[in-house]
Amino acid sequence: MSHSSQTRVQLRTVCLFIALGLLVGCQPNDEDPGLWLKGTEVTRPVTDWTFTQSVDEILIETQPWYGLPHSTTIWCVQLDGALYIGSYGNERKHWEKSIANDPRARLSIQGDLYPVQIRPVIEGELSQQILERYNQKYDMEEVFGKDVPEWWFYQVEQPEASAKKKPS
């Protein structure tokens, strides 16, 4: 093998390792999305999510149609021990579109990874209670000013809990 061929092979190898490093270590940062989430997988069921009340931001990883995970930073609140996440604005976010097709997701909360299912909150009264919690936790007027945008909320369920709720 010639010296120039060896150099090309080495360059390709280095580029491959750099690309793999970016893919494997690409977690979201603030408003910048990422791919796979890192952390310790939690396999025990969570029956009370109140520990999230002191957590300002969590990460969500969804599975879009194109096969690579999509992760982003989101806010959360707990209400009566249940966990809810939300999104605002005129257009649905990328993660919302993904869960509309596949409700399975993973949440990263303080370095722990929770496999979950995400379901839209349809009930108006519950949505209002969640919005009040969001206002308490995040002071929406301070964040958005007087024009607080419309919000959509989603309930976080663990796969085992979702399976138990199905009618027989």
Task: Give the label of every model feature segment.
Residues 2-15:
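Bacterial N-terminal signal peptides that target proteins for export
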Residues 55-89, 105, 116-118:
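Short beta-strand segments
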Residues 27-69:
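Short, conserved active-site entrance elements at the starts or edges of catalytic domains
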Residues 50-53, 75, 146-147:
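Short, surface-exposed loop and linker segments with low hydrophobicity and enrichment for Pro/Ser/Thr
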